[in-house]
Design a protein with these regions (language model features):
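A generic structural signal for ordered alpha-helices
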Residues: 2, 9, 46-50
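Active-site-proximal beta-strand elements of phosphoester/diester hydrolases
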Residues: 3-15, 40, 98
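Cys-nucleophile CN-hydrolase/nitrilase-fold catalytic domain and related Cys-dependent amidase chemistry
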Residues: 17, 26-104
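PLP-dependent aminotransferase-class I/II
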Residues: 23
Length: 106
C-alpha cells in the first residue's frame, strides 16, 4: 500500500499580507520536509483585516497565487490555498472568498 501524507496548516493571519505569505511558506516547506504530498491552508490565509476589497487579487495572476504556484512546483506537491479574497470586477467593493487547488506542476 502506498503511503500518502497530507498536512493541514493552522496559522494566525493578520492584516500584513506579505508576513502572512512568508509564514505560510514556512509551514508549507516544513510540511514538505516531513513528506507531505498535499498541504491545505486555512481560510483567509493571506489576509485578515478591514481592507478586504483593497487586498483582493486576481486568480490566477495575483501575488498569492504566483507565490503558492511556485512553491507547489518547487516542492512537487499539491497545495490547497484555503481561501483568499479574489477581485470582483462587477462589484469591486465585494470581493469573492475563493479557494483553489494547485497541482505539483504549478
Amino acid at each position: 500500500m502506498t503511503k500518502f501524507i497530507a498536512a493541514a496548516v493552522q496559522m494566525d493571519s493578520q492584516d500584513d499580507k506579505m508576513a502572512n505569505l512568508a509564514a505560510a511558506e514556512g509551514y508549507i516547506r516544513e510540511a514538505a520536509a516531513r513528506g507531505a504530498r498535499l498541504v491545505v491552508l486555512p481560510e483567509s490565509m493571506n489576509y485578515i483585516g478591514r481592507d478586504m476589497a483593497q487586498e483582493a487579487e486576481a486568480i490566477p495572476g495575483g501575488p498569492t497565487f504566483q507565490r503558492l504556484s511556485g512553491l507547489a512546483r518547487e516542492l512537487d506537491l499539491w497545495l490547497e490555498a484555503g481561501s483568499i479574497y479574489e477581485s470582483n470586477q462587477e462589484d469591486p467593493a465585494r470581493p469573492f472568498n475563493t479557494t483553489f487547488l494547485i497541482r505539483p506542476d504549478g
